[in-house]
């Protein structure tokens, strides 16, 4: 009797946006190539597609990118807007900024519909956390928080932004129950008392969402960061991107900065707005970043990143208007400064800031966002990979170092194990690697590379079945 060889197994570690998009691409491309395999989505979360970004249920938490740019499929830019019309009710325009919860639902439905329609690969969702991965030349052994082990032929780390590891937190605050380390952890904002002022450390996009969520009558929300800079805002009617001129001057940071500023100024003179110029840089950002020397990259990450981010990653117009209203009413203050110390006082916290200022607050919430350096976070999987030399930090210490197709580079520098990553983990190599327009393209590239690496298992596959969800959002479907 001849036994049937087991199907190759691909692990996707993480079921947020990056992991879900990768699983979708693996299922679609495996079907197109006739590759039989098992795709294992590994994450303790009950539903795929949500992750830290899209698990919020607050309808005031909006996407920071217009709906027309948020399709999950690179080849079908209207896919998300068709889904909104077909599945979310109401009428949506490409320029609308919709609730993030809707996008999480969209990703979940897309994955379910893809698994139903494309049958060459089989999707399995294991609700467990991967805490270690022993990478070999042909087989990866995963260890889970539950103690279980599993062997796979290839793995994709879709870990999302690094967990908070704020270096700014003084000793008197670190273990205090009134300090919220991660505002997106389950139930974190529910711990904020109904009364008393609140200090938010960080003035970026996270702060904007948290300020709206914790606002109460009679409360002042204080937002603090070293620069005091708030993100710029999108226009309600975004203009199309303006392509930059050929930026082939000196490959140093100073020369590139001059060229980019000239592009912004020229675009502003021509159309009255700098935003289209910055949006036009999106397709070439990774190439420009790759031209810089290691020293210039490190210098930019240290000195220039914040100014770039406040212009590049902008607020939805509605969110910006809410912040304006809170500031005008005296319910939100924004200032530059740093936390020096904190101590319990009168049932709350007395927080000492630079400049001799003190605040009395009920809660302090870290809104500084994800750190860049994986060596600074207490993540068991990342710690194991780095300690074992199966991975190394990316340029400037940001993320993990990868080859051009997202394959992890070990300490020795030559890709060996069939182990890939995408999204936030590639910031050191690409700079811009956290938004869906970048991640969806990376997911397609990673899926293609993974499938090419699998042991030959091409067999006849069932004819794709068209699911009800897929039909409802097909091009040309009734609106």
Q: What spans do the regions from the language model cover?
A:
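Flavin (primarily FAD) cofactor-binding/catalytic cores of flavoenzymes
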Residues: 2-45, 52, 90-250, 254, ...
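Redox-cofactor-proximal catalytic regions of oxidoreductases
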Residues: 45-89
